[in-house]
């Protein structure tokens, strides 16, 4: 597995924060690093396989990656993101207690993926741009300024994450997308789902299309197919069982949609013919 080292990304040995844009981020094999990072998805779509679990990421996704986590990107489509790198929560010169603002693992579950709405994403970009402008300066005031900006970034993300901000339709759409990640195999009635998240059906269609480039049903089908592809690669379940587990009632229809999406059949993926990045 590829290991990325801080010496190749941080501007100096005493720098606590570094900014690494990926505009765009291409498919990238599984790797880990000797530093931590916050991945901020600007726009586009892709699959982020995090510690073996696939997540669909779009504009507004924020992922917190620790130094022992392994992850990869695949099936990217104009995926543009910015990585905010930091050595460790306890390696800041002027800040202490940052760990309390970061996601916490509880009972083996780590809430690695958050979502923010478009207006918050704009504020995030501004903070990141300020940090990036100061990267070449190593004096104490500049170091303190970068660390303060990093603290502001964490506070903004925490206050604006799904769990704490459901006051507008964009935030409710983000909550809906997170719900689909857990309920993709369920039979989805879009009228009922729109009501569940206090959205009109028209608003749901419009905002989801704006954020992902896909209609709701097309997004759900892609999500199901992504989950199925992951199971084909990483489980011994039959194609039929995987189809049913991922929300398809007809394995032949599943195979047709799968081939249309990936240009490979489920059997091809199972046999590794697509040259999956290891």
Swiss-Prot record:
Keyword annotations from UniProtKB, A to Z: Activator, Cytoplasm, DNA-binding, Repeat, Rhamnose metabolism, Transcription, Transcription regulation
A GO cellular component annotation here is:
cytoplasm
- SUPFAM superfamilies per UniProt: Homeodomain-like (SSF46689), Regulatory protein AraC (SSF51215)
Domain HTH araC/xylS-type, by residue range, is 174-272
Q: Which GO terms describe its molecular function?
A: DNA-binding transcription factor activity; sequence-specific DNA binding
Question: What's the encoding gene here?
Answer: rhaS
Tell me which NCBIfam families the record gives: PRK13503.1
Matching CDD domains, A to Z?
Answer: cupin_RhaR_RhaS-like_N
Q: How does it assemble?
A: Binds DNA as a dimer.
Which subcellular locations apply to this protein?
Cytoplasm
Q: Which GO terms describe its biological process?
A: positive regulation of DNA-templated transcription; rhamnose metabolic process
Organism name:
Shigella boydii serotype 18 (strain CDC 3083-94 / BS512)
Site Interaction with sigma-70: give positions: 241, 250
* Name of the protein in question: HTH-type transcriptional activator RhaS
DNA bind region: 191-212, 239-262
The role this protein plays is: Activates expression of the rhaBAD and rhaT operons.
Checking InterPro entries in the record gives:
AraC-bd, AraC_XylS_family_regulators, Homeodomain-like_sf, HTH-like, HTH_AraC, RhaR_RhaS-like_N, RmlC-like_jellyroll, Tscrpt_reg_AraC-type_HTH
Q: Which Pfam families match?
A: AraC_binding, HTH_18
State where it is primarily located: cytoplasm
């Amino acid at each position: 597995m590829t290991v990325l080292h801080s010496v190749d990304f941080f501007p100096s040995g005493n720098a606590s924060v570094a900014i690494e844009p990926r505009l765009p981020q291409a498919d990238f094999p599984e790797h880990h690093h000797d530093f931590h990072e916050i991945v901020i998805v600007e726009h586009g779509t892709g699959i982020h396989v995090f510690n073996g679990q696939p997540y669909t990421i779009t504009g507004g996704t924020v992922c917190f990656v620790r130094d022992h986590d392994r992850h990869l990107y695949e099936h990217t489509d104009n995926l543009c993101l910015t990585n905010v790198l930091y050595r460790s929560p306890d390696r800041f010169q002027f800040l202490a207690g940052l760990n309390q603002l970061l996601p916490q693992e509880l009972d083996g579950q780590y809430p690695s993926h958050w979502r923010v709405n478009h207006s918050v994403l704009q504020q995030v970009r501004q903070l990141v741009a300020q940090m990036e402008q100061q990267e070449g300066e190593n004096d104490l005031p500049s170091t303190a300024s970068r660390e303060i900006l990093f603290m502001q970034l964490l506070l903004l993300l925490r206050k604006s994450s799904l769990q704490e901000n459901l006051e507008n339709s964009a935030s409710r759409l983000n909550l809906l997308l997170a719900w689909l990640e857990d309920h993709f195999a369920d039979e989805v009635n879009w009228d009922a789902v729109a009501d569940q998240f206090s959205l009109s059906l028209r608003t749901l269609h419009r905002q989801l299309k704006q954020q992902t480039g896909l209609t709701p049903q097309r997004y759900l089908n892609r999500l199901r197919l992504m989950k199925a592809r992951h199971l084909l690669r990483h489980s011994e379940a039959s194609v039929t069982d995987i189809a049913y587990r991922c929300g398809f009632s007809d394995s032949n229809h599943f195979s047709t949609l799968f081939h249309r999406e990936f240009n490979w059949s489920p059997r091809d993926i199972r046999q590794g013919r697509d040259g999956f990045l290891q």
